[in-house]
């Protein structure tokens, strides 16, 4: 296996699209996402190329979490929130999503809607699969990139020529395809998966059991062991066990930097909750005082990266326990590599267009 580059979201889209454009019989493409918004041109281009690849005989498999069809899109309610059918609505936002799924299937691709709700009117953020990965033949991509806004700050690590990791994720997909409601938790029998790969990297999949996350615990342990520096990116202000662990690291004179979106980046009511979280941390004098919010960038932070000394964790997990409480399936890969850790930080700086604070 060759060295692993780390890509931004648009670079990830470009590589997948370029592969799909020429893929034919004998080629394999897998793409897993939680968010799905083909209204964005790069996402739509990728979907159209996947349709073409399937028509040419390539094995194309797309996993889309039910969140994309149950959570509101703007002011429009998702069809899987009140129905079992993707076509139960004529609303504009969801009509084209459903058309893309239908076009993929008609072309011969397999589309799996993961973690479908058991009941109508269920909480659309509970029991989700937040897992994102892709496979193009023997190359494997793992990280946090949704098939949504291409301009968000994000990260995917690429494992070139890695049939071992590819087989693990292909076998995982087969289990999900066979599970009731295509639910990750049931596919994995409620057990998180931890596999040490040939190069020493660790691939972790959280099954989505409520109040349990191997990825979260691994991240907290890495911060606890750090002696020099901690660098973390996440969507939300850190809170709970994460902010307490960061605060203890800061008190050990570990240099801590956290990049996350300010409350103003979120729509109501989430912005109020985020502002309250930030205020509570400031009142308690916790680690927020030593952290850096994303005030110098207009771009939305979606990357989930943790660097603790030479340890790098990159994946779909935000390292806070909101998703853990709701039972969210996640994926991450962990390396012990100063070079990769540095490269991940450089990727974030490049996307922000500014040196890291």
Language model: regions and residue ranges:
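Hydrophobic side-chain positions on well-ordered alpha-helices
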Residues: 53, 248-249
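Amphipathic alpha-helical interface segments
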Residues: 334-357
């Amino acid at each position: 296996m060759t060295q692993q580059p780390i890509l931004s979201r648009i670079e990830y889209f470009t590589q997948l699209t370029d592969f799909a454009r020429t893929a034919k019989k004998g080629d394999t493409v897998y793409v897993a996402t939680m968010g799905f918004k083909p209204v964005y041109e790069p996402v739509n281009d990728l979907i159209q190329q996947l349709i073409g690849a399937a028509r040419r005989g390539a094995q194309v498999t797309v996993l889309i979490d039910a969140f994309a069809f149950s959570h509101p899109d703007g002011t429009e309610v998702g069809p899987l929130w009140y129905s079992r059918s993707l076509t139960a609505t004529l609303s504009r936002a969801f009509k084209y999503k459903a058309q893309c799924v239908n076009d993929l299937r008609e072309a011969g691709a397999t589309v799996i809607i993961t973690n479908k709700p058991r009941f109508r009117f269920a909480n659309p953020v509970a029991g989700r699969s937040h897992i994102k990965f892709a496979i193009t033949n023997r190359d494997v991509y793992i990280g946090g990139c949704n098939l949504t806004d291409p301009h968000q700050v994000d990260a995917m690590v690429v494992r070139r020529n890695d049939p071992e990791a590819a087989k693990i994720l292909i076998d995982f997909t087969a289990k999900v395809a066979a599970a009731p409601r295509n639910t990750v938790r049931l596919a994995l029998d409620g057990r998180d998966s931890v596999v040490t790969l040939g190069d020493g990297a660790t691939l972790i999949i959280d099954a989505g059991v409520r109040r349990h996350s191997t990825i979260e615990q691994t991240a907290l342990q890495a911060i606890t062991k750090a002696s020099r520096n901690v660098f973390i990116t996440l969507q939300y202000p850190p809170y709970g066990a994460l902010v307490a662990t960061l605060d203890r690291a800061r008190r050990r004179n570990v240099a801590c930097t956290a990049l996350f979106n300010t409350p103003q980046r979120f729509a109501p009511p989430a912005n109020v909750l985020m502002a309250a979280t930030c205020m509570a941390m400031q009142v308690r004098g916790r680690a927020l005082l030593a952290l850096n919010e994303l005030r110098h960038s207009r771009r939305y932070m979606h990357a989930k990266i943790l660097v603790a000394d030479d340890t790098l964790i990159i994946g779909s997990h935000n390292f806070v326990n909101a998703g853990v409480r709701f039972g969210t399936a996640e994926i991450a890969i962990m390396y012990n590599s100063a070079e990769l850790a540095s490269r991940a930080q450089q990727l974030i700086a490049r996307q922000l267009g500014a040196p890291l604070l």
